[in-house]
Amino acid sequence: MAGRSNPRHARWRRQGGPSAATVIGLLVCVVCFSAAFFLWKAALSGSGRNESGEEPFRPVVGDPPYRVCIDAGHGGSDPGARGVVEEKEMTAQTSEALLALLEADPNYIPLRSRESYDATAKPSERAGAINAQIPQLLLSIHGNSAPEGSAAAGFECYPSVPGRTWHRESYYFAQQLAQGMQAAGAKLRGHGGIRYIYYQGEVKQLVESTHTEVRDERSFTLLEDVNCPAVLAEQCFVTSEEDVAQFGSEEGCKTVARVYYEAICAYFGTQPLDTPL
């Protein structure tokens, strides 16, 4: 009859799904949980802690003036890579502009790895010259290259590898360099622009910085043999017209020098000067 309900149908309606009150309760729980999570993240960010509750790493640097060595990676009879520009010319221009910025800043004592850009010096010889000056930080400036027809471009840098005395400090400095270059418009290669290099005899193996295992193979000579935190930077591809226009031309080298200078300031915790080049 139309006026009577079927008990079986009523039971089905009661058991067919959660009530509105239950759904609302679940939604409230989800919202509360999400709010608590974001408040926790904000608290960590405000306190400077990471998700494990630990303070983020900061190098212990002491008081200024800080001794910073700049290494032009090629020079003399060693031209480095050739392309749109010659690597040794680009590294010399960048090094000179960076040294000028450091010389103008009383927080720093700039040091050089070679007597002149026309001097030929092996990495082992430069490492010895660097150590003799007792630096607190080393930046080795290089340019990258690729075979003809390759579209390879971008910035990458190589800190002292895991397990070495100055690895954590070097990695921290590498982060400042990569972040600065990205902000300047460079494409970052690899994981965040940071990679490791190992040599197995004459064979070079590139490893992403996510691989943190300690290995016995040596990395770049300068990174292995200097007694301070060190990073080797490949500021752009000398074989890429676009890269060179942005970061390897005369003005591009000045741009990169400024990025490197500000990364050094970030490492030591000083305020960069507005020094024009």
Region locations from a protein language model:
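Short linear motifs in intrinsically disordered/low-complexity regions
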Residues: 7-10, 51, 64-65
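Intrinsic disorder/low-complexity detector
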Residues: 8-11, 76, 80, 146, ...
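N-terminal Lys/Arg-rich, disordered targeting/topogenic segments
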Residues: 1-21
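The N-terminal extracellular segments of secreted preproproteins, especially immediately downstream
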Residues: 28-31, 68
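Catalytic-core environment of secreted peptidases
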Residues: 57-83, 139
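Acidic/histidine-enriched, beta-strand-rich ligand/metal-binding domains
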Residues: 31-32, 39
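Active-site-proximal helix/loop segments of hydrolytic enzymes
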Residues: 16-26, 37-47, 53-60, 92-277
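Glycine- and acidic-residue-enriched helix-capping/strand-helix junction motifs
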Residues: 80-93
